[in-house]
Amino acid sequence: MKFVFILDPLEKLKSDKDTSLAIMREASLRGHELFVSMQHELFLHGATARIIARKFMFTEQSYTLEEALEYAPAGFDGIIMRKDPPFDNEYLYSTYLLENAASQGAKVYNNPSAIRSWNEKMSVTRFPQFAPEFLVTSNNDLIREFLNTHQDIVVKPLDGMGGSSIFRLGLSDPNISVILETITNFG
């Protein structure tokens, strides 16, 4: 099968911890043909969805890429959106372009309207029975109150990824104010 992965720039991915590369490696081991693309390589020509992609192959130490070519998205067995946050206008427009490609027969995994309207960090709110008590807020006073109640908490942004801006806070932490300003953007 032929799969195209819409990714962040490959040079920014950390091969030892990036889940997109892990998924791709497993797909490669199973004999699938892999291609990579980025958000700005999705487009409409007239009303026709198109994608610029490069054939991707793992090597012992790294990977190789073939020349970028233009394809009809429906020519792939699957398009897999794996772009990390931020959820900005480019991301939003990419989901619209992927919806258009799907309406023309492309098999798009990670449903474009679902990833547009569903924040993965908020998914815990649907299954609270499987999570510790949590608080979702940008209000510093509420976070301090939660910290006083639990004495040891983890705070992280809803739009982060890769462990960025995740902090463990304890009551005696000397940087509580700075951490809360950082995490809430002075909320």
Summary of predicted features, one role per range:
Residues 3-29, 34-83, 88-187:
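Active-site nucleotide/adenylate-binding loops and adjacent lid/helix of ATP-dependent enzymes
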